[in-house]
Amino acid sequence: MSPNTWVIEMPTQKTRSHPYPRRISPYRPPVLNRDAFSRDAPPMPARNHDHPVFEDIRTILSVLKASGLMPIYEQVSDYEVGPPTKTNEFYSFFVRGVVHALTIFNVYSLFTPISAQLFFSYRETDNVNQWIELLLCILTYTLTVFVCAHNTTSMLRIMNEILQLDEEVRRQFGANLSQNFGFLVKFLVGITACQAYIIVLKIYAVQGEITPTSYILLAFYGIQNGLTATYIVFASALLRIVYIRFHFINQLLNGYTYGQQHRRKEGGARARRQRGDVNPNVNPALMEHFPEDSLFIYRMHNKLLRIYKGINDCCNLILVSFLGYSFYTVTTNCYNLFVQITGKGMVSPNILQWCFAWLCLHVSLLALLSRSCGLTTTEANATSQILARVYAKSKEYQNIIDKFLTKSIKQEVQFTAYGFFAIDNSTLFKIFSAVTTYLVILIQFKQLEDSKVEDPVPEQT
C-alpha cells in the first residue's frame, strides 16, 4: 500500500446487504420528482438518455466536433464513451489540415500588401494595432486546434470520469444531478450574431471593390473568432459540471455539521416547515450514516479534483492565448473609442459599432470564464471548511474528520492559465486594470504622433 493512502475503519456492528445500498432519503420523504440532493430509491429503474451528463451541451459539442476541436467519439454505454472510429478520426484530421492551410495563407496575406484594404484608420499607430490584433486571432485559433488535437485522449478520459462518477452517485443515492445549461445556446447565438455583424461592418468599411483574398481573410477571421469563443464557452460548461458535483458532496456533508445536527435535536426541521421553508438541501442527516457517506465523499472529492486538474491541463495553453488576445482586443477597441470621441473630425458610426460589438463579445466571455472558474474553485476549497464543522460526537467520527483534514482536502486548488496567474472572480478586474495601463500608453503614443504632425520640422536653407 502506498504510504500516502489511508483507511477509515467502518463500524463492525453494521453490515451491507448490497454492495451499493440505496437508503431512503434523510432529507425529506420520498417523492416522484427528485432533485440532485435526493437519495430516494425509485420504484422502477428509469432508463437513462445517451450521455446523461453531456445531453444538455450536445449543441456545443456538435459544433466542436464538426470543426475538429473535439473528437467524434463513440458511445459504448450510457456511462462510457469510446475513441472515434477511423472514419471520424480521418474527418477531424482533414478539417484540422484545412485550418492549418488557411492559417498559412492568411499569415502570408498579412505580410503582403494584399490585406492593406482591410485596415481603415487615420494614424499609423491604429494600423499597427489592428494588424497585431488580427495576427493574435489567427495564432490563438491555431494554438487551440493544435492543443485540442494533442489532448484528444485526455478529453475523452475526463468525459468518462465524469460519466463514471455520475453512475456511482446514481447507484449509491439514486440521484440524478440536475443541471441547467440554457446559457450555452444563448452564448452560441450571441457569438454567431456578433461575428456576422462584425464582418458586415468590416465589408462596408472597405473602400473600393473587395478582392477575393480579402473575402477569404474576413470569412476565416470570423470563423476563427467564433470557434475560439465557442471553445471557451465549452470549457466554462465543463467547469460548471464539476461545480455541480462539488456542490452535491458539500451539501451532503453540510447535513452532518454541528449546526444542522443541533437543529435536529431542537426540532428545527418542524419549525422551518411551519415557516414555509421547504428547502430540502439543508435538512440534517442521521449521524449513523456519516462513516459510510464520508468514504463516498472523500472518494468523490478526489475524483473531482482529478477531473478539475485534468480540465486545467487540457485548457491552460488555450486560456493563456485567449486571455492575451482578449486583453489586446479590449484595449485596442477602447483606444479606438477614445480616438473617435476625442478626435476633431466626424465620428464614424461604423467604427463605433465595430468597437462596441467586440467589447460586448469579449467582456461577456471573460465574465463567463471568470465566474465559472471562481465558482468551481470556491466550491472545491469549501469541502474542508464544511468538514471542520462536522458534529463529531464520538471519537470514531473525530478520527475520520482528522484523517480527512490531514490529507489533500485541506490543500487549496486553483484554476490557472498555465501557472502564470489564477483565474477566478477577480480575473476580470485584473484584466481591466491592465487594459487601463496599456490604454494610457497608447494614448501617449497618439499624442506624440499628433505633436509631430502639428509641429513639422522647418526646412533648412
Curated annotation (Swiss-Prot):
Cross-referenced InterPro entries: 7TM_chemorcpt
Membrane topology label: Multi-pass membrane protein
A GO CC term assigned to this protein in UniProt: axon
Disruption phenotype: Impairs avoiding N,N-Diethyl-meta-toluamide (DEET). Leads to high male courtship toward males and mated females. Also leads to diminished aggression level of males.
Keywords: Cell membrane, Membrane, Receptor, Transducer, Transmembrane, Transmembrane helix
Residue intervals on the Cytoplasmic side: 1-100, 149-180, 236-317, 370-414
Keyword Oxidoreductase: no
One GO MF term: taste receptor activity
Single biological process term from Gene Ontology: sensory perception of taste
Residues annotated as transmembrane: 101-121, 128-148, 181-201, 215-235, 318-338, 349-369, 415-435
Pfam family, one: 7tm_7
Localization in the cell: Cell membrane
Main location group: membrane
Extracellular topological segments: 122-127, 202-214, 339-348, 436-461
Tissue specificity of this protein: Expressed in the adult labellar chemosensory neurons. Expressed in tarsal neurons for male-male courtship suppression. In larvae, is expressed in neurons of the terminal external chemosensory organ, and the dorsal and posterior external chemosensory organs.
Role noted for this protein: Gustatory receptor which mediates acceptance or avoidance behavior, depending on its substrates. Required for the response to N,N-Diethyl-meta-toluamide (DEET), the most widely used insect repellent worldwide. Functions as a pheromone receptor for a male inhibitory pheromone and promotes male-male aggression and suppresses male-male courtship. Also promotes preferentially virgin females courting over mated females.
Protein family: Belongs to the insect chemoreceptor superfamily. Gustatory receptor (GR) family. Gr21a subfamily.
Protein name: Gustatory and pheromone receptor 32a
Species the sequence originates in: Drosophila melanogaster
Gene: Gr32a
